[in-house]
Design a protein with these regions (language model features):
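Acidic/aromatic-lined carbohydrate-recognition and catalytic surfaces
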Residues: 2-209, 213, 217, 228-238
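A glycine-centered loop/beta-turn motif at secondary-structure junctions
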Residues: 218-222
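Extended, hydrophobic alpha-helical segments in both membrane/secreted and soluble proteins
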Residues: 223-227
Length: 238
């Protein structure tokens, strides 16, 4: 396996989400914004709805609120297909709403935890779109490999690995081929619209750390790293 590059976050260590408790003894309350509460009385929740309910949340005696993703996303996987880590799904609110929500919870002694998806990005993310447009440096942001030809001459995926959502975890990468004319594929361990990023690329790792630090600076004090267990791949197997 390729050795992982050395990199580090710049977060200041914290031992408790709020109230002096450690995480092991803290009460963490999950909020899926789309279904929590609508500030306009509509069918779907929004961040303004969460802000309105901060006193109620605090009254439950919770130490931290864990939010499912509300970043910009085409919503092919309920927000776990992120197209921009620095933007908010406009159906749910704005960056100003997020800042107000974090501040309101902090005033009530409640910390904030985000779901953070670093294993993959939406195929609508700028990185993947630039890769598709032919910017070769962005090819290294993902796992792009040539297919293989079987004895019968049929084109096969690079490996026989399956997606968690069914079928192969490889999809054609546009119309691109390698130097031998073999079609290229990109890896997606989940939906085909969720391209796995190359954790072993130092630039990618630094970009992901920038994301985490950005939200830490906004006041987020906890992160649940979704499917982080699959972020490293055995490159010798690809």
């Amino acid at each position: 396996m390729t050795q992982a590059p050395t990199a580090s976050l710049t977060l200041t260590p914290v031992t408790s989400p709020a109230g002096g408790k450690d995480f092991a003894s803290s009460v963490i309350y999950q909020v899926y914004p789309k279904s929590f509460y609508s500030s306009a009385g509509g069918a779907y929740g929004d961040l303004r709805g969460v802000i309105e309910k901060v006193p109620y949340i605090a009254s439950l005696g919770v130490d931290m609120v864990w939010f499912n993703p509300f970043f910009a996303s085409p919503q092919n996987d309920n927000g776990y297909d992120i197209s921009d880590y620095y933007a908010i799904n406009p159906d749910l609110g704005t960056m100003e709403d997020v800042e107000e929500m974090i501040a309101a919870l902090a005033e009530h002694g409640v910390g904030v935890m985000f779901d953070m998806v670093l294993n993959h990005v939406s195929t609508e993310h700028e990185w993947f779109q630039r890769a598709l447009a032919g910017e070769r440096e962005y090819w290294d942001y993902f796992y792009i490999r040539p297919g293989k030809y079987a004895e019968d001459g049929q084109l096969r995926e690079p490996t026989n690995w399956e997606s968690k959502f069914g079928g192969s975890c490889w999809s054609r990468f546009g119309e691109y081929t390698d130097e031998h004319g073999t079609p290229l594929f990109y890896m997606h361990l989940y939906d085909r619209t969720q391209a796995d990023v190359n954790w072993y690329n130092p630039t990618v790792r630094d970009e992901l750390f920038k994301v985490v630090n950005f939200w830490y600076e906004k006041g987020v004090r906890g992160f649940r790293f979704d499917v982080i267990n699959v972020i490293g791949k055995g490159e010798e197997l690809l």
